[in-house]
């Protein structure tokens, strides 16, 4: 059965919930709520990686996340895993010392840290960095380019001794809406490489664009639209993207994703419960290829 990772942004500027959980008490309360709703993992992040986001100094990042991770580790024990969403070596190490057991790495570069500390590691694909990643991202073949990058990084992690390696195609990270849809449509290509796949589509801009196109009576994205784009429309607000988020999370799980990263844990857990009755669970969802 697929797992649900709950997003806990301890930031002032995240695209979906920036500022909502900046206070330690609010962040801890939200983490406990997601655990109660059925999240298998609570992913704590202290640096926004939305398009155009400013870099955050690791010391500032750690000041945001470490008290939250420590409090959640104390309250949750082994019932729910804690993950650190970071691209900084020092933050990953400090978070693991505070209780995190998974490094969710948007830079796909921290496998030596995971190997050293004996924790799990997620390699995510990103074109460029958050400041520039949406500046006309281009690929020869987005599905194959992402696959090759992630397989190379995951292979390096396995060779270094990381026992638990996940791969994430990085939906929305240096990709157009068409790129995102192609990656979802061909998720089986990445799943077929044998590493457990994590997918995060929750509340992202491409969903807002798709929903706005539908509301405006425009055709869905496809070859004809790419060749002759319809007039641009403003994406629907973040708060109106829950249904689209759930739909794409269900699609990802049906097509082999072992974990989905979401803001709306409660409805996603319900979706997992429905799917679990009809889709056999893998024998070992954390298996890495030999």
Feature annotation, model-predicted:
Residues 3-5, 164, 196:
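Structural motif
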Residues 12-33, 49-75, 81-82, 87-89, ...:
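Active-site-adjacent loop and "lid" segments of alpha/beta metabolic enzymes
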Residues 170:
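Conserved Motif II region of HX4D acyltransferases
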Residues 1-2, 7, 13, 153:
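Proteins enriched for Cys/Gly/acidic motifs involved in redox and nucleic-acid/cofactor modification
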Residues 2-6, 32-46:
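N-terminal glycine-rich anion-binding loops that anchor highly charged ligand groups
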């Amino acid at each position: 059965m697929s797992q649900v990772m709950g997003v806990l942004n301890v930031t002032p500027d995240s695209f979906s919930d920036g500022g909502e959980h900046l206070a330690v008490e609010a962040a801890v309360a939200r983490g406990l709520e997601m655990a109660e709703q059925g999240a298998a993992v609570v992913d704590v992040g202290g640096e926004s990686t939305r398009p155009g986001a400013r870099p955050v100094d690791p010391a500032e990042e750690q000041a945001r996340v470490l008290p939250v991770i420590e409090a959640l580790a104390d309250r949750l024990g082994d019932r729910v895993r804690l993950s650190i969403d970071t691209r900084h070596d020092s933050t990953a190490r400090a978070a693991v010392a505070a209780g995190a057991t998974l490094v969710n790495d948007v830079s796909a570069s921290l496998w030596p840290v995971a190997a050293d500390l004996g924790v799990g590691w997620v390699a995510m694909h990103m074109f460029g960095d958050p400041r520039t990643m949406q500046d006309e991202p281009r690929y020869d073949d987005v599905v194959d380019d992402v696959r090759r990058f992630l397989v190379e990084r995951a292979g390096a992690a396995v060779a270094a001794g990381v026992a638990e390696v996940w791969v994430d195609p990085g939906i929305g990270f240096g990709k157009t809406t068409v790129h995102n849809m192609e990656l979802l449509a061909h998720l089986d290509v990445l799943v077929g490489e044998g590493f457990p796949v994590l997918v995060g589509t929750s509340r992202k801009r491409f969903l807002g664009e798709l929903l706005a196109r539908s509301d405006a009576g425009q055709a869905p994205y496809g070859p004809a639209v790419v060749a002759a784009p319809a007039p641009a429309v403003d994406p629907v607000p973040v708060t109106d993207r829950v249904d689209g988020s759930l739909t794409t999370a269900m699609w990802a799980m049906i097509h082999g994703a072992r974990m989905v990263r979401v803001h709306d844990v409660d409805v996603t857990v319900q979706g997992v419960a429905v799917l679990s009755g009809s889709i056999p669970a893998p024998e070992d969802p954390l298996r890495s290829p030999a």
